[in-house]
Design a protein with these regions (language model features):
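Short hydrophobic alpha-helices and adjacent helix-cap/hinge residues
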Residues: 1-196
C-alpha cells in the first residue's frame, strides 16, 4: 500500500510569530516585512494571520531579491512600520542581511522580530523559535500519527506540521532601549501555546 509521509517544518507557524508581535506590542498595528521572492508562501501565511488577528494587523511587505535591493526596500519600509519582521527565508538565513534589517530597525527605533535565537542575540527584540528537544518530540508524535493514519484512505497527502509549540526568546537589553516592558519569556511562550 501507499505510505503516508509526514513533514515537520523547522520553524514555528507565522500565526505564532504574529501572536508574539501582538503580545509584545499590543498598541501597534503596522508590521513591516522584508521578503525574498521565494518566501511568497510565508508572506501569504503571515497575511492570513494578520487579517485574522483581532484587531487586524496592517502588513507592509517589500520584496528584496538580492543584497543590493535590501537597502532600498528597508528605506521604503521603515517609515510605514511600527515593527520589522525577518522571515525564516534567505534573508533570515543570511547573517549580513539580518544585520542590515537590525541596523535599519535600530536607526529608526523600531523593534525587529524573527524566528531565530541568533537574531535576538544580535539585537532583535524577540523571536518565536523551535528548540531541538521540542522538534524531536514533535517528530516522534508526527511519526505515530503517520503510522496510525496508514490504514485510512487519504494516505497520499503528506501530513505537514509547523514546529509547535514555539519557544519565545527576548532581548531584555533591546526592550529596555526601546522603552518596552514585554512579558517574561515563559509567560509569552505559554501564551503562544494557548489555543487562539
Amino acid at each position: 500500500g501507499a505510505r503516508r509521509v509526514g513533514v515537520l517544518l523547522r520553524d514555528p507557524a507565522m500565526a505564532d510569530q504574529l501572536a508574539l508581535v501582538n503580545a509584545v506590542l499590543p498598541q501597534k498595528r503596522r508590521l513591516g516585512v522584508i521578503a525574498t521572492p521565494e518566501s511568497e508562501p510565508l508572506v501569504r501565511e503571515l497575511q492570513r494571520a494578520a487579517q485574522n488577528a483581532n484587531p487586524a494587523w496592517d502588513l507592509q511587505v517589500e520584496i528584496a531579491p538580492d543584497a543590493r535591493s535590501l537597502a532600498t526596500a528597508l528605506r521604503a519600509l521603515v517609515p510605514r512600520s511600527d515593527a520589522l519582521m525577518v522571515l525564516p527565508d534567505l534573508i533570515g538565513d543570511s547573517q549580513a542581511a539580518t544585520l542590515s534589517v537590525l541596523h535599519a530597525g535600530a536607526g529608526a527605533g523600531l523593534p525587529v522580530f524573527g524566528a531565530s535565537e541568533g537574531l535576538v542575540r544580535s539585537g532583535g527584540l524577540a523571536a518565536a523559535v523551535s528548540t531541538p528537544g521540542q522538534l524531536a518530540q514533535q517528530a516522534r508524535q508526527l511519526g505515530q500519527k503517520v503510522a496510525s493514519a496508514g490504514s485510512t484512505g487519504n494516505s497520499n497527502s503528506p501530513l505537514v506540521e509547523a514546529a509547535t509549540p514555539a519557544t519565545v526568546r527576548i532581548n531584555a537589553t533591546v526592550a529596555r532601549g526601546l522603552g518596552l516592558r514585554p512579558p517574561e519569556e515563559r509567560e509569552l511562550t505559554e501564551r503562544l501555546a494557548a489555543p487562539r
